[in-house]
């Protein structure tokens, strides 16, 4: 089965090909085509989870944070203030904190948008109910 019917069934536009031209040592022109990915194809490939990255970041952030704590604790247990390992531990620790904070921020923004959508749908429902009983 070819890919074209599947793309048409999914409603995805046909992928355009980006062409790059390169010259080979023998003065021949070689054209390389690279398919471009559309947002619909990305959604189909990820199962619609591209908007929930905060859920994927949390486990990774926790592991990075714990690794940062361990490396920093080992570095400072040897009283090596300012050494490469202590700086590396602090960088890993701060990146873990940053990932946790960004995940929490994304979660808050997502919750606010869900509340706003819920409020809009309730407003429309109440307005529709009033027009039915008026």
From Swiss-Prot:
<dbReference type="GO" id="GO:0001701">
    <property type="term" value="P:in utero embryonic development"/>
</dbReference>
<comment type="subunit">
    <text>Interacts (via C-terminus) with TRPA1 and TRPV1. Interacts with TASOR.</text>
</comment>
<dbReference type="GO" id="GO:0003198">
    <property type="term" value="P:epithelial to mesenchymal transition involved in endocardial cushion formation"/>
</dbReference>
<keyword id="KW-0256">Endoplasmic reticulum</keyword>
<feature type="transmembrane region" description="Helical">
    <location>
        <begin position="84"/>
        <end position="104"/>
    </location>
</feature>
<keyword id="KW-0963">Cytoplasm</keyword>
<keyword id="KW-1133">Transmembrane helix</keyword>
<dbReference type="GO" id="GO:2001214">
    <property type="term" value="P:positive regulation of vasculogenesis"/>
</dbReference>
<dbReference type="GO" id="GO:0048471">
    <property type="term" value="C:perinuclear region of cytoplasm"/>
</dbReference>
<protein>
    <recommendedName>
        <fullName>Transmembrane protein 100</fullName>
    </recommendedName>
</protein>
<dbReference type="GO" id="GO:0045603">
    <property type="term" value="P:positive regulation of endothelial cell differentiation"/>
</dbReference>
<keyword id="KW-0812">Transmembrane</keyword>
<dbReference type="GO" id="GO:0051897">
    <property type="term" value="P:positive regulation of phosphatidylinositol 3-kinase/protein kinase B signal transduction"/>
</dbReference>
<keyword id="KW-0217">Developmental protein</keyword>
<dbReference type="GO" id="GO:0043204">
    <property type="term" value="C:perikaryon"/>
</dbReference>
<dbReference type="GO" id="GO:0051930">
    <property type="term" value="P:regulation of sensory perception of pain"/>
</dbReference>
<dbReference type="Pfam" id="PF16311">
    <property type="entry name" value="TMEM100"/>
</dbReference>
<keyword id="KW-0597">Phosphoprotein</keyword>
<dbReference type="InterPro" id="IPR032536">
    <property type="entry name" value="TMEM100"/>
</dbReference>
<keyword id="KW-0221">Differentiation</keyword>
<dbReference type="GO" id="GO:0050848">
    <property type="term" value="P:regulation of calcium-mediated signaling"/>
</dbReference>
<dbReference type="GO" id="GO:0001525">
    <property type="term" value="P:angiogenesis"/>
</dbReference>
<dbReference type="GO" id="GO:0005783">
    <property type="term" value="C:endoplasmic reticulum"/>
</dbReference>
<dbReference type="GO" id="GO:0060842">
    <property type="term" value="P:arterial endothelial cell differentiation"/>
</dbReference>
<keyword id="KW-0472">Membrane</keyword>
<dbReference type="GO" id="GO:0007219">
    <property type="term" value="P:Notch signaling pathway"/>
</dbReference>
<dbReference type="GO" id="GO:0001570">
    <property type="term" value="P:vasculogenesis"/>
</dbReference>
<comment type="function">
    <text>Plays a role during embryonic arterial endothelium differentiation and vascular morphogenesis through the ACVRL1 receptor-dependent signaling pathway upon stimulation by bone morphogenetic proteins, such as GDF2/BMP9 and BMP10. Involved in the regulation of nociception, acting as a modulator of the interaction between TRPA1 and TRPV1, two molecular sensors and mediators of pain signals in dorsal root ganglia (DRG) neurons.</text>
</comment>
<keyword id="KW-1003">Cell membrane</keyword>
<dbReference type="GO" id="GO:0005886">
    <property type="term" value="C:plasma membrane"/>
</dbReference>
<dbReference type="GO" id="GO:0030509">
    <property type="term" value="P:BMP signaling pathway"/>
</dbReference>
<feature type="modified residue" description="Phosphoserine">
    <location>
        <position position="121"/>
    </location>
</feature>
<dbReference type="GO" id="GO:0071773">
    <property type="term" value="P:cellular response to BMP stimulus"/>
</dbReference>
<feature type="transmembrane region" description="Helical">
    <location>
        <begin position="56"/>
        <end position="76"/>
    </location>
</feature>
